[in-house]
């Protein structure tokens, strides 16, 4: 089996394979909140079978954004909007952690 499809361990984290989906700025958030678009986009990527999926740029304060359409985590509404997206990713990812 090629190494690309072999599990790999980083400390206590074990990935099902060595395929990584890097972060891509999608500029689709509304007021820093994830939307149904994020649920569909990341849900599809999670189902790809990649061992690691890295989310896009996510600002921890409004003035740290690179665009007004970035995801944010500086208020409770943004955290709540991202929860279903992360749950969907976990449900459909190969490692489900």
Give the ranges of each region predicted by the language model:
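Flavin-dependent oxidoreductase catalytic cores
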Residues: 1-97
């Amino acid at each position: 089996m090629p190494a690309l499809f072999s599990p790999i361990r980083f400390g206590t984290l074990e990935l099902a394979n060595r395929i990584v989906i890097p972060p891509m700025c999608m500029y689709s958030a509304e007021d820093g909140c994830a939307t149904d678009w994020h649920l569909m986009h990341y849900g599809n990527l999670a189902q790809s079978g990649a061992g690691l999926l890295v989310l896009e740029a996510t600002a921890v304060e409004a003035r740290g954004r690179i665009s007004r359409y970035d995801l944010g985590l500086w208020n409770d509404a943004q955290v709540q909007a991202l929860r279903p997206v992360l749950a969907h990713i976990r449900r459909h990812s190969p490692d489900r952690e």
